[in-house]
């Protein structure tokens, strides 16, 4: 393991409150390697929170800290934007008679400490969509119905695969609408997945930020 990788792991421990300082200080050149590593791991925001907690003698160079901080501001603004877009798309499906659950990505924010929540590097929006309880007419999955709704909203057709389709609702954020949260290649395992999803889909709950996550 390189020194940059070791420092990266120690910064994560500091961010989580499991240590207070690095095992040894870094030179300016080593800090550049550390920054390259955290960028590669998409952990720029989380590690910067740790950098701010370092004692003065271990602090990263001022120039690097400023550039790091600017990137973190971008991440925080991006998180706010995507959370708002999650609210828009879930409300859109809600009005159309569907319940939805934000998978992976933004839903993971609620498992982060409040201090780190908006520093997570965001990506696209993955949304599991299904009919509300009592309005499913005995159908476990409404794949064709959901696809038609999306195509009508966009005024065009999009690529559809086994478990999701794209919904080009926002100019800079990809939305993947999932008919099921996941799938297996083995048909027997896949059937078990579908049964489990069907049995637990109503355990989805609404969070204060209007982003739905599984209990």
Summary of predicted features, one role per range:
Residues 1-123, 129-215:
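Conserved NTP-donor binding/palm subdomain of two-metal-ion nucleotidyltransferases/polymerases, i.e.
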């Amino acid at each position: 393991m390189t020194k940059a990788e070791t420092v990266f792991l120690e910064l994560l421990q500091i961010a989580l409150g499991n240590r207070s300082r690095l095992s040894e200080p870094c030179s300016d050149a080593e800090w550049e390697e550390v920054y390259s590593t955290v960028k590669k791991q998409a952990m720029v925001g989380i590690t910067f929170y740790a950098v701010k907690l370092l004692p003065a003698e271990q602090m990263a160079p001022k120039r690097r800290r400023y550039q790091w901080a600017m990137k973190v501001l971008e991440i925080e603004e991006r998180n706010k934007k995507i959370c708002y877009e999650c609210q828009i798309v879930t409300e859109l499906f809600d009005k159309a008679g569907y319940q939805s659950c934000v998978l992976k990505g933004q839903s993971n924010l609620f498992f982060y400490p409040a201090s780190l929540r908006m520093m997570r590097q965001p990506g696209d929006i993955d949304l599991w969509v299904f009919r509300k309880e009592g309005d499913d007419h005995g159908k476990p999955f409404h794949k064709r119905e959901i696809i038609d709704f999306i195509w009508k909203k966009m005024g065009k057709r999009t690529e559809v695969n086994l478990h999701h389709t794209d919904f080009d609702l926002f100019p800079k954020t990809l939305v993947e609408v999932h008919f099921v949260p996941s799938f297996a290649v083995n048909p027997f395992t896949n059937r078990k997945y579908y049964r489990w999803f069907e049995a637990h889909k109503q355990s989805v709950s609404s969070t204060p930020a209007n982003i739905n996550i599984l209990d």
